[in-house]
Amino acid sequence: VLTKERKTKNNTSAIEPVFILDQTFCPNIRFMGKGETLSAVKAISYVSGSKFPSGGLCTAGYCVANEKAAELMKDIETHLKLCNNEATTLQVQLLAKQLPSMNQRISEAYINTRRFVNYIKKVLPEAKINFVSEELAKEGYTPSVFSLDLPTKGGSDKEKENYKRELNLQLINLMIQEIPNESKFCVSYGQLKGCYWTIPATSTQGTTKEEDKDYIVRASLSPNMDMERHEDIFMAFVNSI
């Protein structure tokens, strides 16, 4: 579909489109190298540096183009300079320090997340979990964030929703209270240590209409955290409901 030639209404060749890919959640995947998925079309990939690239130490990100779109990088550079939106020297230094370990951190964070997801499935099978399938993970898509829809009860939809929201906060508050040096109420992802929790399960809370928000828990795990402690506290939560 992406490589299909586009025509204008006069049946002349249209301007070739540019495919823009947000790789914030999978910066370790090579989509645009020779022979890869997006090598045959003009494509630009960008990553939020505040996530895995820097481990949360800075907000500067980066973008790259494949060979077909390489000419566009000069325009992107001009735009960043005009808007005074280039990375600072300190941000570049932080990215240079953290990027060499990024792929390893992604792999280890995924291992922790898969372990926690499997544990939740074991001790609270009624919960609904949205996490990458093991089939996709084998292809290299190894995120370390999942959403958790806790089981609820009540005589009406409103009662069920209110009860679930109470459980959400009960779980998160318990995690923060019992593991204050690791668990945080935070919407970010790709951190160097600890576990981040947030509700609703979206990083675009400010741009989502209230009626479209899904009040379920989102958890983001890191490569450096006490997994046994988190499992113990989750078990305590299960025993309390």
Annotate each language-model stretch with its function:
Residues 94-106, 114-216:
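Conserved small-domain helix->loop->beta segment predominantly found in fold-type I
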